[in-house]
Swiss-Prot record:
Might be related to the phospholipid scramblase and tubby-like superfamily of membrane tethered transcription factors. Belongs to the LOR family. This is Protein LURP-one-related 10. PANTHER family: PROTEIN LURP-ONE-RELATED 10 (PTHR31087:SF155), PTHR31087. SUPFAM superfamilies: Tubby C-terminal domain-like (SSF54518). InterPro entries: LOR, LOR_sf, Tubby-like_C. It comes from the Eukaryota.
Amino acid sequence: MAIVSPNFCAPYPIELGIVRKVMTLTDGNFAVTDVNGNLLFKVKEPLFSISDKRILLDAYDTPILTLRENKVSLHDRWLVYRGKSTDQSDLLYTLKRSSMIQIMKPKLDIFLAHNKEMKICDFHVKGSWIDRSCVVYAGKSDAIVAQMHKKHTAQSILIGKSNFSVTVYPNVDFAFIVSLIVILDDINREDSED
């Protein structure tokens, strides 16, 4: 199921490593690698900006997605667009909390751009902020499309990085899944600051 592009789908499971750098000025806040350590994506987040926008770039700095938080929403609504665009015509999906009040176990709904009524989600995410893990499901079903777990290492604690391991199931768009993980991490950081 290609959400971003068929180029980001494989007929076999994909294992990704995601590292969130706590303090960085140059190379982005996230690095996403394959099992061999090859860089696939990175995320640029403006260091000093009033814009709540992140850009998912490929290994060659080509913009793949723009992730924009809608600050006027009560449901932590995020809008995700193709490339560097924020035009409605380039909207790929909207992510929002299933309900306004959620403690420690968030439930998020994802609506693809063609799902204008947003009554039944196209994907949903359940997770545990304590365990820093989540599962992405297709629609309102129990069909898993991806899973994420936080990896704790002594090195990651000492050098200010958070490491995540992600399994993306066959034929699922891994750029889409990476964008969800970036948004989930941001929501988690905002919740822990409140």
